């Protein structure tokens, strides 16, 4: 087993937001998370606004929460933020049964996911510090 891993500490120029127990499979959520990873937050918000994926609205809400955390809790400049990390974790899987013909039943699995978004303030290129 080994020791439990310590949670990652945020740096001074970072802020994060976590959405837990989202009713979507981790694979589908990771498609949307990888779409915004590494982008400036304004571009990421625009991409999520016009995405046709069902979960994109929830990801956008989580990203807006991370931006608000950066602005209000960490005093970071919103215009200089990028999506440093956007990762997905597995949560519970609800098991349900679907009645079939001839007296049989099939199992339906309804997966849930966790989403963590970390935004980081980067220095603008070309500006004198």
Curated annotation (Swiss-Prot):
CDD domains: Ribosomal_L22. One of its GO terms (molecular function) is rRNA binding. The lineage of its organism: Bacteria, Pseudomonadati, Pseudomonadota, Alphaproteobacteria, Hyphomicrobiales. Keywords: Ribonucleoprotein, Ribosomal protein, RNA-binding, rRNA-binding. Part of the 50S ribosomal subunit. GO terms for cellular component: cytosolic large ribosomal subunit. This is Large ribosomal subunit protein uL22. It holds the Pfam family Ribosomal_L22. The gene is rplV. This protein binds specifically to 23S rRNA; its binding is stimulated by other ribosomal proteins, e.g. L4, L17, and L20. It is important during the early stages of 50S assembly. It makes multiple contacts with different domains of the 23S rRNA in the assembled 50S subunit and ribosome. The globular domain of the protein is located near the polypeptide exit tunnel on the outside of the subunit, while an extended beta-hairpin is found that lines the wall of the exit tunnel in the center of the 70S ribosome. Belongs to the universal ribosomal protein uL22 family.
């Amino acid at each position: 087993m080994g020791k439990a891993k310590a949670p990652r500490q945020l740096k001074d120029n970072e802020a994060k937001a976590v959405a837990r127990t989202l009713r979507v499979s981790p694979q589908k959520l990771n498609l949307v998370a990888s779409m915004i990873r590494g982008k400036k937050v304004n571009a990421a918000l625009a991409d999520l606004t016009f995405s046709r994926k069902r979960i994109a609205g929830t990801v956008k809400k989580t990203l807006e929460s991370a931006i608000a955390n950066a602005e209000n809790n960490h005093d970071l400049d919103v215009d200089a933020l990028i999506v440093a990390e956007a990762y997905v974790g597995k949560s519970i899987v609800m098991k349900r049964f679907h009645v079939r013909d001839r007296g049989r039943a099939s199992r339906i699995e309804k997966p849930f996911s966790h989403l963590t978004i970390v935004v980081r303030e980067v220095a603008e290129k070309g500006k004198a510090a």
